[in-house]
Amino acid sequence: MITRFAPSPTGYMHIGNARTALICWLYARSRSGKLLLRIDDTDLERSENRYVEGIKNDLTWLAMDWDICFNQRSRISRYDEVFNSLMDAGAVYPCYETPEELELKRKMMLKMGLPPIYDRSALNMTEQDQKAYSGRKPYFRLKIGRDQAISWEDEIRGKVVFQAKNISDPILRRTDGSYTYMFPSTVDDIDFEVTHIVRGEDHVSNTAVQIYIMGLLGAKIPSFAHLPLLRMGGSKMSKRVGGTEIFKMRDMNLEPMAINSYMARIGTSLPVEPHTNMRSLVDSFDIKLFNQAPIKFELEDISKLNVRLLQKLPFAEVQDRLEACGIKCSEGFWYAVRDNINVISEVKGWAEICGPGVTPVVDDVNRQLLQLASDLLPEGEPNDGTWKTWLQKIKECSGCETRDILLPLRLALTGVPKGPEFAKLLPLIGRVEILRRLRGA
């Protein structure tokens, strides 16, 4: 089993691209197959090396590896070879219209209530037409047999049928000699023996053309699966819609596995749950679980999943990362604060709160209560049982209810209104610092 992820390096990878990559990766790894990373850089004007590096960096950060990587630019001579064979077979023909002329034709056909399909006028040029186009460089179209039906059994959409008469002869090569997406893609899929192709539903019509080309070349047709596109604010995801790039999510300190857990489950019948490693996603993967329903993307959903993931991570999985951020903490500290952070970088704030230098927050109404609390603090360093004993003493001596004690005490000890359980927090702050904060208040 061989599948491929084929990004165009014309922009940074967004969540929609990454989802396709992940599903391709999971499909390959769940079947002990191979994943090809093909860089579709035939768009000479817009493709940039910085985007190639960005794509690779993002995939690596998301824990997705690949078995083979190649750029389409390195295979131009191969595309020329196959293109010339199609020319010799009469399957490709030159055309001379400008983009403006083609757009005018399209509008006229729509005005007449006809589908905007190329009229094949280039196949019936008169001598006068040829003189009119003299000096123009041709572009080339594939001649599709109009009496055929192109079909395949899509792994997500089921039976898909295209009547060739409703398909415009696709452009394979531009006037500058560069190739459009579908031709090099088809040649690569054949040459690298790709068996399974997973991509967005916006490629469904391309699939019909590629199957036709594969038939002309006598190639075996791979299996296809077309995923519904992610939508944000009613529009499909694209590189032109900002805020969804993977590098921005990395800068937000979101966990790679939170993103992967989200991408692997949206659009399926399975609940979106945080997974701490890729193995569990591989083991539960099934392409048949995906459906055709539209998918609305919300970054907030990943943020919420990120919180749930952090609450599951053991200390051993975060220790090195914390130390790399300059945070040296104990296992007990991590388990005390992990339920109170949105992203892992917030651990630093709790490390500072548990250290010296916190300024107590207190009003005059609670000053007497805090002084009493300091007098009642049990002797010795706080342990897991200190909080229960201390709270009971404060309640008995002050006559206050628990709810009237918690907030003043938390503000005095941490400077913030919410945080870890006191039973876990007190041993981290230590007796001397607790007394300093209460009496300093």
Swiss-Prot record:
- EC identifiers of the protein: 6.1.1.17
Motif range ('HIGH' region): 7-17
* Alphabetical GO biological process terms: glutamyl-tRNA aminoacylation
Q: Does the keyword NADP apply?
A: no
What's the domain of life for this entry?
Bacteria
The entry lists its GO molecular-function terms as: ATP binding; glutamate-tRNA ligase activity; tRNA binding
Q: Which NCBIfam families match?
A: gltX_bact
Q: Which PANTHER family match?
A: GLUTAMATE--TRNA LIGASE (PTHR43311), GLUTAMATE--TRNA LIGASE, MITOCHONDRIAL-RELATED (PTHR43311:SF2)
Recorded protein name is: Glutamate--tRNA ligase 1
Originating organism: Anaplasma marginale (strain St. Maries)
